[in-house]
Amino acid sequence: MIGKEVILQDIVLELSELQPEVQPVDLFCEEELPTEQQETEEEPAIERSAYKVVVLCGCCKVKLRIFVKATQFGIRTLQDILIEELQLLCPECRGNCNHGGV
């Protein structure tokens, strides 16, 4: 740069001057992106089965039934949660219990 003002010739660099072996890349190459149909075909189908889950209310011990559709892993996880961490409540008991653990 010569002088106080910057001119375009001072900024633009020619790659051929720096590295003569650098060649421009053709961005319109022959590659194709997969279509949505191809993407969905590649995903394995997740097998879900219907289950009836019977548990006792956490307060009054009345039988509660819920119906779910889950994977084998999902139903086992739900079983573990219901046994160890979570209790379902019937509609009558939900009004009697404090919400949010308070």
UniProtKB/Swiss-Prot annotation:
A motif (Nuclear export signal) lies at residues 75-83. Keywords: Activator, DNA-binding, Early protein, G1/S host cell cycle checkpoint dysregulation by virus, Host cytoplasm, Host nucleus, Host-virus interaction, Inhibition of host innate immune response by virus, Inhibition of host interferon signaling pathway by virus, Interferon antiviral system evasion, Metal-binding, Modulation of host cell cycle by virus, Oncogene, Transcription, Transcription regulation, Viral immunoevasion, Zinc, Zinc-finger. The keyword Transcription applies. It is found in: Host cytoplasm; Host nucleus. A motif (LXCXE motif) lies at residues 27-31. Highly phosphorylated. A zinc finger (unnamed) spans 57-93. It comes from the Viruses. Homodimer. Homooligomer. Interacts with host RB1; this interaction induces dissociation of RB1-E2F1 complex thereby disrupting RB1 activity. Interacts with host EP300; this interaction represses EP300 transcriptional activity. Interacts with protein E2; this interaction inhibits E7 oncogenic activity. Interacts with host TMEM173/STING; this interaction impairs the ability of TMEM173/STING to sense cytosolic DNA and promote the production of type I interferon (IFN-alpha and IFN-beta). Belongs to the papillomaviridae E7 protein family. This is Protein E7. It comes from Human papillomavirus 19.
